[in-house]
Swiss-Prot record:
Reactions the enzyme catalyzes: [phosphate](n) + ATP = [phosphate](n+1) + ADP
One Gene Ontology term from the biological process aspect of the record: polyphosphate biosynthetic process
Name of the protein in question: Polyphosphate kinase
Region annotation Disordered: where it falls in the sequence: 1-36, 58-82, 251-303
Active site: 584 (phosphohistidine intermediate)
Species whose genome carries this gene: Rhodopirellula baltica (strain DSM 10527 / NCIMB 13988 / SH1)
Gene Ontology CC: one annotated term: membrane
Modification after translation: An intermediate of this reaction is the autophosphorylated ppk in which a phosphate is covalently linked to a histidine residue through a N-P bond.
Length: 852
């Protein structure tokens, strides 16, 4: 419609003017006399990208953010100096680590909420356990390195690394205590009431014990291998696995000796280009030997007690189904036929692998008396990154990072709370663990086993009702995706609207004879990715396919390495990322030959190209064939892959070059309008708000009277509602069935209502150390819908938490006479209603032309 064209063009011109001012500060809109490609911004020198390509590798020096490398000096603006001065003022900022622990506490509150269905509560408890594992590996690991090397340097909240570790330890001890109190006192008893029973082989009936023993002898005994620990270094055990520590002493009767299969020796050499955590990683572990055999045939005097370890590994399932305990059969009533281990209405019984092995542990040690056998678990430091200045081969370097991570220091030790002092002291000494990060666990270690219970079949009444993703009314299954996008921009809200159109677009492109090229960035993908399959199929059919595969995506490195190799073999031109930066932008470009010429079809997103997590994460997709956006996307992609000087983009914001400046300019614009008596308003939704410069800019906007509403799911270092500093700032967090992952931003902009989606949170790593995109939402209907959706997040009174000035959170409840409102449920019902309305509903509203 004409209205849409007029509004779109007005938005473009405003974006173009801002881009000129952003890229060329001090120049008028027509003075482009600043050298292109040498854009200066706080934190860095001028940048050109240097990609790691699959065949040709660049060895030019580049900025590196690796652990242990001294950062380059940079010219700081007056604004930046102001922020650094403010950062020393502790009351201005919440500590990042404690803010994250507040987030995990909100997830734990979901597990503690009786209004949430039982298996969903179990799932939330499992999530808190998984979250805490990653926090310990990454954040605690990083702080321990800082405590050793950083001296007394303080973070923006005013704490040293040592002080942060002390605060984290205290908070985590309370968090873990609360997890297990909830498990013992509520969840396990409630599960038992619904006939989902966790069985301890030491306390069960003879019938269940017989079934447990059959499983142990048939499926477990032959797989596991104990390792002796007498007079030898502790074996190199994997992190996050469950292991059994066994305390032994000589028995009165010596039974037949069994020699368990020897474990493979481990090569602990560490590549010179990797940051090491301590000298302990250079120790060479000794393979386990027969527990009873003396070394080299020499006689040995056995000590009074010995220790052995049994790694349970990951081959065997941890949750072991057992027969259901059936009630006595009444006389004259025929028993019902059922599968003893199927989770039907009659129930489900299970034992944990560590309990099973502990009960029958004597079988591994004939001739020895077992004093005690207790499970333990270690967490290793995962904050090890490639020092890219010394890595000529990124793929090989990342494989070495994975190996080094496997051998890194232990940052946390979890032990069964009933372990005796000998086992406890032995483990602490063996792993050289900081005592404040030793956790005595009164219950099963590693609560992620509860995920398995959440997936039990036949327990639907204990889970949330299904909300199947809906097809967008803008997409007709009978027509090509190219036709649908040609009719106008399509915005999808996942997971309420299906991610299938994104997958379908790539699958159609792979076989369409008119498609000439496909360009794709992959950060995290699924295990059997249809998107990767489509890229390989396109390359095999002779299309020009380029994929940037970010090998440095933490904890997905191994999968991405595997995909990169497979795609190369299929003929895809693979780029391994950019030296010194992580490529985190979500963009796909398809170049298609059409009667009017070449057309670029582009997908921009806030989430990963992962069709599995797209059903669990709240994200935004925009599908467009807009010429200017397509041109910008191509220039962005060429800059990333071609080691060329980035050119100014008309509409897209790009980190680490211009995105920070653009965000600050947008906030500053609202500040200036408010000072001039106009209405200033900012609504922003993101995963984390950490950057002190952005926070300081928001404080200034608040002091000028700008209304600021922030929906921050996780870490928020800003203090809202502080008189004289942030009185007009409101921060809420939504924790519900879907993970809130979208980054969307609204600026009133004098009534123009500018909307953006982005791959970037407002964190230093996103703005300065990653390749990210900020994408304007130009289509008027999409812009209106996105703005209304953002506003809904501040009406939730069921699963919303409002942040307090001290960094704590209060759960929002309906006020008197206020109806309950749950934003995720509301969004899903809206999508269902839109789907029912259909694609060809008559226009019911009219939009007039308005002057810019």
């Amino acid at each position: 419609m004409a209205t849409g064209v007029s509004s779109r063009d007005g938005s473009r011109e405003r974006i173009r003017r801002r881009a000129v001012a952003r890229d060329h500060p001090g120049c008028g809109p027509h003075r482009l006399d600043r050298p292109i490609g040498h854009i200066r911004y706080p934190h860095r020198h001028s940048i050109s990208f240097s990609p790691f390509a699959s065949l040709t590798l660049s060895h030019d020096p580049a900025p590196s953010q690796s652990v242990g490398k001294r950062p380059q000096k940079s010219t700081k603006t007056a604004s930046r100096r102001k922020v650094e001065t403010a950062a020393a003022d502790a009351p201005r900022f919440i500590n990042r680590e404690l803010a994250w622990l507040e987030f995990n506490a909100r997830v734990l509150d979901q597990a503690d909420d009786p209004s949430v269905r039982l298996l969903e509560r179990a799932k939330f408890l499992a999530i808190t356990s998984s979250n805490l594992d990653e926090f310990m590996m990454v954040r605690v690991g990083s702080l321990k390195l800082q405590a050793v090397s950083g001296g007394g340097r303080r973070d923006p909240s005013g704490r040293t690394a040592t002080e942060q570790l002390q605060a984290i330890s205290k908070r985590c001890q309370g968090h873990v205590d609360r997890q297990y109190e909830l498990l013992r006192n509520e969840l396990l008893p409630l599960l038992g009431e619904h006939k989902i029973n966790q069985v301890d082989p030491a306390e069960c009936s003879d019938r269940l014990l017989a079934a447990a023993e059959r499983h142990f002898r048939g499926d477990v005994l032959a797989v596991l291998s104990p390792q002796a620990l007498h007079d030898r270094r502790f074996p190199m055990l994997p992190g996050l696995g469950i292991h059994l520590c066994v305390q032994l002493r000589p028995g009165d009767e010596i039974g037949p000796q069994r020699t368990p299969p020897p474990s493979d020796s481990l090569d602990n050499r560490v590549p010179s280009n990797l940051k090491r955590n301590s000298d302990t990683a250079n120790q060479q572990p000794t393979p386990a030997e027969n527990i009873s055999a003396p070394e080299d045939g020499a006689e040995q005097t056995e000590p009074e007690t010995q220790f052995a370890v049994i790694p349970l590994g990951r081959t065997l399932g941890r949750v072991i189904p057992l027969p259901i305990e059936k009630p006595p059969i009444e006389k004259g009533v025929a028993p019902k036929e059922s599968d003893d281990t199927s989770p039907i209405e009659s129930g489900y019984s299970y034992a944990l692998l560590e309990d099973l092995v502990s009960h029958f542990v004597d079988e591994f040690f004939p001739g020895r008396e077992v004093i005690q056998c207790k499970p333990f678990r270690i967490t290793r430091n995962a904050d090890i990154e490639l020092r890219e200045d010394g890595a000529g081969d990124l793929l090989g370097g990342m494989e070495e990072v994975l190996e080094s991570r496997r051998l890194s220091d232990v940052v946390r030790l979890e032990i069964d709370a009933n372990a005796n002092s000998e086992i406890r002291d032995y483990l602490i000494k063996s792993f050289n663990v900081d005592p404040q990060f030793v956790f005595d666990i009164d219950g099963p270690l590693d609560l992620t086993y509860l995920f398995a219970l959440h997936g039990l079949k036949g327990m639907n009444t204990l889970r949330d009702d299904e909300w199947p993703p809906q097809r967008s009314p803008r997409i007709d299954p009978a027509e090509s995706m190219f036709t649908s996008i040609s009719d106008g921009d399509i915005m999808l809200m996942h997971p309420y609207e299906s991610f299938d159109p994104v997958v379908r677009l790539l699958e159609e492109a792979s076989v369409d004879p008119d498609v000439l090229a496909v360009k794709q960035i992959l950060y995290r993908t699924s295990r059997n990715s249809p998107i990767v399959a489509a890229l390989m199929r396109a390359a095999e059919r002779g299309k020009y396919v380029t994929a940037i595969v970010e090998l440095k995506a933490r904890f997905d490195e191994a999968r991405n390495i595997e995909w990169a190799r497979e795609m190369e073999q299929a003929g895809v031109q693979v780029i391994y990322g950019i030296r010194g930066l992580k490529t985190h932008a979500k963009v796909c470009i398809i170049v298609r030959r059409e009667p009017q010429g070449l057309v670029r079809y582009v997908h921009f997103g806030t989430g990963n190209y992962n069709e599995v997590t797209a059903n669990l994460y709240g994200d935004i997709s925009v599908l467009t064939c807009d010429e200017i956006l397509g041109t910008d996307a191509t220039m962005f992609f060429n800059a990333v892959t071609g080691a060329s000087q980035p050119q100014p983009l008309q509409q897209l914001g790009m980190a680490p070059l211009t995105l920070r400046r653009q965000i600050l300019d947008l906030i500053q614009g609202e500040t200036e309008r408010s000072r001039q008596g106009q209405k200033g308003e900012i609504i922003a939704k993101m995963n984390a708000l950490v950057d002190t410069e952005v926070i300081d800019s928001l404080y200034m906007a608040s002091q000028a009277g700008v209304k600021i509403r922030l929906n921050v799911r996780g870490v928020c270092c800003l203090r809202p509602g502080v008189p004289g500093m942030s009185e007009t700032i409101e921060v809420v967090s939504i924790v519900d069935r879907f993970l809130e992952h979208a980054r969307t931003f609204y600026f009133r902009h004098g009534g123009d209502h500018e909307m953006f989606i982005s791959s970037a949170d407002w964190m230093p790593r996103n703005l300065d150390r990653r390749v990210e995109l900020l994408v304007p939402v130009i289509d008027p209907a999409a812009r209106k819908r996105l703005r209304e959706t953002l506003q809904l997040y501040f009406r939730d009174n069921q699963n919303a938490w409002r942040m307090q000035p001290d960094g704590s959170y209060q759960r929002l409840k309906p006020r008197k006479n206020e109806a309950p409102m749950r934003v995720q449920e509301t969004l899903y019902h809206q999508v269902v209603e839109n789907r029912k309305a259909g694609k060809h509903a008559p226009q019911s509203t009219f939009e007039t032309h308005r002057p810019d």
